[in-house]
Amino acid sequence: MIHRPGPVKPRLRGLLHLYAFFASLPALAVLLLACQTGRAAVAATVYGLSLVALFGVSALFHRVTWSPRARRWMGRLDHAMINVSIAATFTPFGLLVLSGTLATVSLAAVWGGALGGILLHVLWIDAPKSLSAVVYVVLGCSGITALPQLVSQVGWGPTGLLALGGALYSAGAAVYAFRRPDPAPGVFGYHEVFHGLVIAAAVTHYVVVAVYVLPHV
């Protein structure tokens, strides 16, 4: 039997998210220092810890060479953190900006969708990348019904930044699904482009939460 080697992991695989993990730790502290109420502290904790978990798990998954079995479990955890981070990013808006039934329903919908996404990847670890990308985009858009109230509360500027972050996440999902562009497969491939777009989107959303949402209460 002829042994066929698997694809070579790019040398920079996971490095961007490793740097982002280290940056997310003081970023969480900054969020907590900006909180004036207990409710804001809860929102900041959920959101900030999700960034730490997202980038930490991703860096661990992609930087370490795992056994096939361990890699499958780490892949499940990596996908789970993506779903959690999407819901957690919406949480400060649901808790601090939106009000009434809309806030409750929107939070329930996005966290319910995140749970569904987690179950999908736990039960179907080999789900096509295109399906995973669609799930992430749909989940990210699940709070779009809150847009009018969001604009009225924080204005068009922060809402535009929020939309920009969503567009960056969507672009990353497209790169992940189609595996293009793939500039230097042995060093910096399509997955690194995806990770870079995720970081850019996360920074954009972080600015909105830290500057406009937490001081809202």
Indicate residue ranges for each PLM-predicted region.
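Multi-pass alpha-helical transmembrane bundles in non-GPCR membrane proteins
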Residues: 1-217
